[in-house]
Amino acid sequence: MIKGGGAALLQEKIVASVSRAEIIVVNRTKLVDQLGVFPLPVEVVPFGWQVVFNQLESLHGNPDLRLNKGKPLVTDQGNYIIDCHFRKIKNPKLLEHQLNMIPGVVENGLFINLCTKMIVADGEQLTVRDRK
């Protein structure tokens, strides 16, 4: 699962990691067959963000610095978000490890094994999915 479109991925991941249950509610348009359809946010410290950007390019992440009114978007923790367009993420665990090994990366939007239940809204219908 990829989260962090609202730029609070560090906070969300901290809460998810200490929760007994992580229940996510989504619209069916967020469901994909392959991770990478939507950009993967990577939270980075402002100092040296360009170096991290270059490292993300070397991982074929096709990165974009997320902007707000022409300036880097700043998270509640004072960091920047770089959105990576990997197209297909075949091995999320490996990618998460590679991202976390880059000096300057604070967190990434891969929420691996943190969601225990997902509620999917499709018009008037709700579907509950438990983690497999």
List the predicted regions and their residue ranges.
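Conserved phosphate- and dinucleotide-binding cores of soluble alpha/beta proteins
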Residues: 1-132
